[in-house]
Design a protein with these regions (language model features):
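Short solvent-exposed beta->alpha transition segments
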Residues: 52-108
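Exposed beta-sheet edge and beta->alpha loop/turn motif
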Residues: 101-157
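Bacterial N-terminal signal peptides that target proteins for export
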Residues: 1-9
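Short, aromatic-enriched amphipathic alpha-helices that serve as compact interaction elements
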Residues: 34-50, 64
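Bacterial N-terminal signal peptides
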Residues: 8-16
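Alpha-helical scaffold domains
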Residues: 29-30
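Sec/Tat signal peptide C-region and signal peptidase I cleavage site
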Residues: 18-24
Length: 157
């Protein structure tokens, strides 16, 4: 009985420790990450959404969402539903992407993002990041404020 209890406890402890380590692998904003790199981090994570744990790509993307954006989308479970919905599901496990700078200032940067989804259809997005200017741990960090609805560009075939 004691051995069985100890084994069960060990399995639960190992599972908890393993989950904690994988979530620790996610990147968090810091003021040394450039605007285009924020988008690269988000797109690379979404490209392999379940690589670290279920929905790790979505959670990685959430980490770089501007607080105002998070207020609009609601908590993380709502954000996950939004990304998995019709408007943005093509971002999940997409095959490739390109990021092209459209314009910037010291406070914002806008990019055109074209992704090739797993159905081999291209989609274009306008993606904007802004430098967080309020006091706190995010001060000076570039964070996503806007991702447009996708514009389908057609098939790659």
């Amino acid at each position: 009985m004691l051995k069985k209890l100890l084994l069960t406890f060990s399995v639960v402890l190992f599972s908890f420790f393993n989950i904690s380590l994988t979530k620790a692998d996610l990147l968090f904003p810091n003021n040394s990450i450039f605007p285009a790199d924020v988008i690269k981090i988000q797109l690379n994570a979404l490209m392999d959404n379940d690589s670290k744990f279920k929905d790790s790509g979505i959670e990685q993307t959430w980490n770089f969402a501007h607080p105002n954006n998070k207020k609009n989308t609601g908590p993380l479970p709502n954000f996950k539903m939004m990304i998995k919905g019709n408007s943005y599901k093509m971002l999940l496990n997409h095959l490739s992407h390109t990021i092209t700078a459209l314009g910037s200032s010291n406070e914002w940067a806008q990019f055109e993002v074209v992704i090739l989804d797993k159905e081999k259809i291209y989609h274009k997005f306008n993606w904007q990041v802004e430098k967080f200017t309020m006091d706190g741990p995010l001060r000076g960090c570039w964070l996503t404020t806007v991702v447009s609805n996708p514009i389908p560009l057609g098939s790659s075939i």
